[in-house]
């Protein structure tokens, strides 16, 4: 089955499906799912010896301002394999700017049908302070050793901003 058949979610923007590209705490390898074939490609070996603090993926059938689908970080008790799909609920967004322009990273927690562990997290401020600090630290530094690349973290925004990011990106993809 092609991942193109995976919808953006069950009920946008509150109930989304995230296609995982990079497992949490994995080796410093940037994987990307090829949208046409569904194959997981090695995009690059990261120069900085760092690992993603959460599972990292995207929402299918969306188009962010950077030209890619909406990026999503998914905290889970266990790393998820690349190419897997998890049902989630957005709780916040980390706004950033990089060498390509505006770049937002939505944070979404597993849907209650997958795990009740995250039911109390309704907004980014409900996330553990240490997790937010780890995410910020990672994105401030993960491109430091890559020539011509840079990142500026602009700050955290709430669940409403995350939902708006998903909706506008979904509409942009539908209208392209």
UniProtKB/Swiss-Prot annotation:
GO biological process terms on file: phosphate-containing compound metabolic process
Cofactor dependency: Mg(2+)
Positions annotated to bind Mg(2+) 2: 71
Keyword Hydrolase tagged? yes
Question: Example GO molecular function term?
Answer: inorganic diphosphate phosphatase activity
What Pfam families does the database record attribute to this sequence? Answer: Pyrophosphatase (PF00719)
GO CC annotations?
A: cytosol
Q: Which UniProt keywords apply?
A: Cytoplasm, Hydrolase, Magnesium, Metal-binding
Q: Could you tell me which InterPro entries the record lists for this protein? A: Pyrophosphatase, Pyrophosphatase_sf
Is Metal-binding given among the entry's keywords? yes
Residues noted as binding substrate in the record, renumbered to the chain: 30, 44, 56, 142
Compartment(s): Cytoplasm
Q: What is its main location?
A: cytoplasm
EC code? 3.6.1.1
Positions contributing to Mg(2+) 1 binding: 66, 71, 103
What catalytic reaction does the record list?
Answer: diphosphate + H2O = 2 phosphate + H(+)
Assigned protein family = Belongs to the PPase family.
Q: How does it assemble?
A: Homohexamer.
Name the job this protein performs: Catalyzes the hydrolysis of inorganic pyrophosphate (PPi) forming two phosphate ions.
Name recorded for this polypeptide: Inorganic pyrophosphatase
Q: What phylogenetic lineage does the species belong to?
A: Bacteria, Pseudomonadati, Pseudomonadota, Gammaproteobacteria, Vibrionales
